[in-house]
Protein backbone atom coordinates (compact mmCIF):
# COMPACT_ATOMS: atom_id res chain seq x y z
CA UNK A 1 0.00 0.00 0.00
CA UNK A 2 2.82 2.41 0.84
CA UNK A 3 4.27 2.00 -2.65
CA UNK A 4 0.90 2.74 -4.31
CA UNK A 5 1.40 -0.28 -6.56
CA UNK A 6 0.89 -3.99 -6.33
CA UNK A 7 -0.42 -7.14 -7.92
CA UNK A 8 -2.21 -9.91 -6.06
CA UNK A 9 -2.36 -13.14 -8.05
CA UNK A 10 -4.53 -15.87 -6.57
CA UNK A 11 -4.48 -19.45 -7.77
CA UNK A 12 -7.57 -21.59 -8.09
CA UNK A 13 -8.84 -24.39 -10.27
CA UNK A 14 -10.96 -24.36 -13.38
CA UNK A 15 -12.86 -27.27 -11.77
CA UNK A 16 -13.17 -25.52 -8.42
CA UNK A 17 -16.59 -24.00 -8.95
CA UNK A 18 -18.35 -26.99 -10.54
CA UNK A 19 -19.50 -28.46 -7.23
CA UNK A 20 -19.33 -32.17 -8.06
CA UNK A 21 -20.55 -34.80 -5.60
CA UNK A 22 -18.06 -35.38 -2.79
CA UNK A 23 -16.13 -32.14 -3.33
CA UNK A 24 -17.69 -29.85 -0.71
CA UNK A 25 -14.42 -28.97 1.03
CA UNK A 26 -12.48 -28.53 -2.22
CA UNK A 27 -15.22 -26.48 -3.90
CA UNK A 28 -15.79 -24.22 -0.91
CA UNK A 29 -12.06 -23.53 -0.57
CA UNK A 30 -11.82 -22.56 -4.23
CA UNK A 31 -14.93 -20.36 -4.09
CA UNK A 32 -13.44 -18.62 -1.04
CA UNK A 33 -10.50 -17.60 -3.25
CA UNK A 34 -12.91 -16.06 -5.76
CA UNK A 35 -14.69 -14.18 -2.98
CA UNK A 36 -11.57 -12.71 -1.38
CA UNK A 37 -10.32 -11.75 -4.84
CA UNK A 38 -13.46 -9.68 -5.43
CA UNK A 39 -13.01 -7.90 -2.10
CA UNK A 40 -9.29 -7.20 -2.55
CA UNK A 41 -9.75 -5.97 -6.12
CA UNK A 42 -12.27 -3.36 -4.99
CA UNK A 43 -10.76 -2.33 -1.65
CA UNK A 44 -7.22 -1.81 -2.93
CA UNK A 45 -7.81 -0.46 -6.44
CA UNK A 46 -7.40 3.11 -5.13
CA UNK A 47 -3.81 2.18 -4.24
CA UNK A 48 -3.10 0.91 -7.78
CA UNK A 49 -3.22 -2.66 -6.48
CA UNK A 50 -5.00 -5.21 -8.63
CA UNK A 51 -6.16 -8.69 -7.70
CA UNK A 52 -6.86 -11.50 -10.14
CA UNK A 53 -7.34 -15.26 -10.13
CA UNK A 54 -5.64 -17.80 -12.36
CA UNK A 55 -7.89 -20.83 -12.89
CA UNK A 56 -5.58 -23.72 -13.60
CA UNK A 57 -6.38 -26.92 -15.39
CA UNK A 58 -4.19 -30.02 -15.64
CA UNK A 59 -0.48 -29.34 -15.19
CA UNK A 60 2.11 -32.07 -14.76
CA UNK A 61 2.90 -31.17 -11.14
CA UNK A 62 1.17 -30.85 -7.78
CA UNK A 63 -2.14 -32.66 -7.37
CA UNK A 64 -2.16 -33.89 -10.97
CA UNK A 65 1.22 -35.59 -10.61
CA UNK A 66 0.04 -37.43 -7.48
CA UNK A 67 -2.87 -39.06 -9.33
CA UNK A 68 -2.74 -42.55 -10.77
CA UNK A 69 -1.77 -42.81 -14.42
CA UNK A 70 -5.30 -43.96 -15.24
CA UNK A 71 -6.84 -40.90 -13.53
CA UNK A 72 -4.34 -38.58 -15.27
CA UNK A 73 -5.34 -40.05 -18.64
CA UNK A 74 -9.02 -39.71 -17.79
CA UNK A 75 -8.56 -36.01 -16.99
CA UNK A 76 -6.38 -35.36 -20.04
CA UNK A 77 -9.01 -36.93 -22.29
CA UNK A 78 -11.40 -34.14 -21.25
CA UNK A 79 -8.98 -31.49 -22.56
CA UNK A 80 -9.55 -30.76 -26.28
CA UNK A 81 -5.80 -30.97 -27.03
CA UNK A 82 -5.42 -34.13 -24.89
CA UNK A 83 -2.35 -32.71 -23.11
CA UNK A 84 -1.46 -31.03 -19.85
CA UNK A 85 -0.32 -27.45 -19.51
CA UNK A 86 3.26 -26.32 -19.06
CA UNK A 87 4.58 -24.01 -16.37
CA UNK A 88 5.41 -21.42 -19.07
CA UNK A 89 1.66 -20.98 -19.61
CA UNK A 90 1.32 -19.87 -16.00
CA UNK A 91 4.42 -17.64 -16.20
CA UNK A 92 3.00 -15.90 -19.29
CA UNK A 93 -0.28 -15.16 -17.52
CA UNK A 94 1.56 -13.82 -14.46
CA UNK A 95 3.70 -11.56 -16.65
CA UNK A 96 0.55 -10.27 -18.38
CA UNK A 97 -1.11 -9.46 -15.05
CA UNK A 98 1.99 -7.77 -13.64
CA UNK A 99 2.25 -5.51 -16.68
CA UNK A 100 -1.47 -4.70 -16.91
CA UNK A 101 -2.75 -1.92 -14.67
CA UNK A 102 -6.34 -2.21 -15.88
CA UNK A 103 -6.79 -5.96 -15.45
CA UNK A 104 -8.49 -6.25 -12.07
CA UNK A 105 -10.97 -8.71 -10.55
CA UNK A 106 -10.46 -11.04 -13.51
CA UNK A 107 -10.53 -14.81 -13.60
CA UNK A 108 -8.16 -16.08 -16.26
CA UNK A 109 -8.58 -19.70 -17.30
CA UNK A 110 -5.41 -21.61 -18.16
CA UNK A 111 -6.91 -25.01 -18.70
CA UNK A 112 -6.62 -25.96 -22.36
CA UNK A 113 -10.28 -25.21 -23.03
CA UNK A 114 -12.01 -27.33 -20.39
Which residues are covered by each model-predicted region?
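C-terminal substrate-recognition "lid" of short-chain dehydrogenase/reductases
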Residues: 5, 83-110
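Conserved SDR Rossmann-fold cofactor-binding beta-strand/turn motif
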Residues: 50-60, 109-111
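Residue(s) in the substrate-gating loop at a strand-loop-helix junction
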Residues: 13
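Hydrophobic structural elements of the Rossmann-like NAD(P)H-binding subdomain
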Residues: 9, 51-54, 64, 105
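Short, flexible catalytic-loop segment of classical short-chain dehydrogenase/reductase
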Residues: 17, 34, 55-66
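Catalytic Tyr-x(3-8)-Lys segment
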Residues: 70-88
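Active-site helix of classical SDR
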Residues: 29, 37
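Alpha-helical segment proximal to the catalytic Tyr-Lys
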Residues: 42-46
Amino acid sequence: INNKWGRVINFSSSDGSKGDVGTAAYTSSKLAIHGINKVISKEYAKFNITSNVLLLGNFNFGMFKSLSRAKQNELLNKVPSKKHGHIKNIYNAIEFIINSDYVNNSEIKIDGGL
